[in-house]
UniProtKB/Swiss-Prot annotation:
Signal peptide coordinates: 1-21
Subcellular location(s) of the protein: Secreted
Role according to the record: Secreted cytokine-like protein. Inhibits cell growth in vitro.
InterPro entries: Secretoglobin_3A
Pfam families named in the record: SCGB3A
Tissues expressed in: Highly expressed in lung, where it localizes to epithelial cells lining the trachea and bronchi. Expression in lung is mainly restricted to bronchi, submucosal glands of the trachea, and tracheal epithelium, with little expression in terminal bronchioles. Expressed in uterus where it localizes to epithelial cells of the uterine glands. Also detected in heart, stomach and small intestine.
Organism ancestry: Eukaryota, Metazoa, Chordata, Craniata, Vertebrata
Record's protein name: Secretoglobin family 3A member 1
GO BP of this protein: positive regulation of myoblast fusion
């Protein structure tokens, strides 16, 4: 029963508008940015993670917490690693942080 409920919650999360937007954005390849524009983009990504007022009710945070995965260290670690990434990975991390923030 727990497995069925978890699967149902995961399907609802993936099929919601946010999940669709995430997968649609991941299919589109961003244009390669010049190296000079990479540093401001990395700083913008690191500072672009807002705190939502209902973050404790988010589905993804609940799923990760039930599996024993803390979300806050994951986001902080991603912020620290953004400055070391290449231009291709900056867009992917930006999408990931946006989805993680949206869900929790």
């Amino acid at each position: 029963m727990k497995l069925t409920t978890t699967f149902l919650v995961l399907c609802v999360a993936l099929l919601s508008d946010s999940g669709v937007a995430f997968f649609m954005d991941s299919l589109a390849k961003p244009a390669v940015e010049p190296v000079a524009a990479l540093a401001p983009a990395a700083e913008a990504v690191a500072g672009a993670v807002p705190s939502l007022p209902l973050s404790h009710l988010a589905i993804l945070r609940f799923i990760l917490a039930s599996m024993g995965i803390p979300l806050d260290p994951l986001i902080e670690g991603s912020r620290k690693c953004v400055t070391e990434l290449g231009p291709e990975a900056v867009g992917a991390v930006k999408s990931l942080l946006g989805v993680l923030t949206m869900f929790g």
